[in-house]
Amino acid sequence: MSQFIDFTLPSTVPGRTLHGFRCVPEGQVRAVLQLSHGMVEYIDRYRPLAEYLADRGILVTGHDHLGHGASIRTKEDYGYFAEPDGNRAVLADLHAVTVLTIIEGNAELLAEDE
């Protein structure tokens, strides 16, 4: 049985917080997969996929990008990353979650956008 661990960590944008989860398999970790959701999505949408993969030995992690899911502070934040260089903030936040998640083994990034 896999275990979900919810986490928060500071965004690379000052004053902002990222919310995410890690789904840890029972037993040996065969691989690590970091999920990156698409625009106007949220990471909790992928919990069933994470559980499916974790039940097969894959540690899965992911977070809500700024302006998405539980990382939204106000309705004005909806779909908004940051100014200036919001795209760089998203990449830096992805990297921060990667560093937080690194363990021995294989790691892959699964990105999705419709």
What are the language-model segments listed below?
Residues 26, 55, 103-107:
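Secondary-structure boundary motif
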Residues 82-109:
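Alpha/beta-hydrolase active-site loop
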Residues 46:
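Divalent metal-coordination and catalytic microenvironments
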Residues 50-76:
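Conserved alpha/beta-hydrolase
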Residues 111-114:
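Gly/Ala-rich beta-loop-alpha elbow adjacent to hydrolase catalytic centers
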Residues 30-34:
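Alpha/beta-hydrolase fold active-site loops
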Residues 35-41:
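Active-site glycine-rich loops that stabilize anionic/oxyanionic intermediates
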Residues 1-27:
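N-terminal cap/lid segment of alpha/beta-hydrolase-fold proteins
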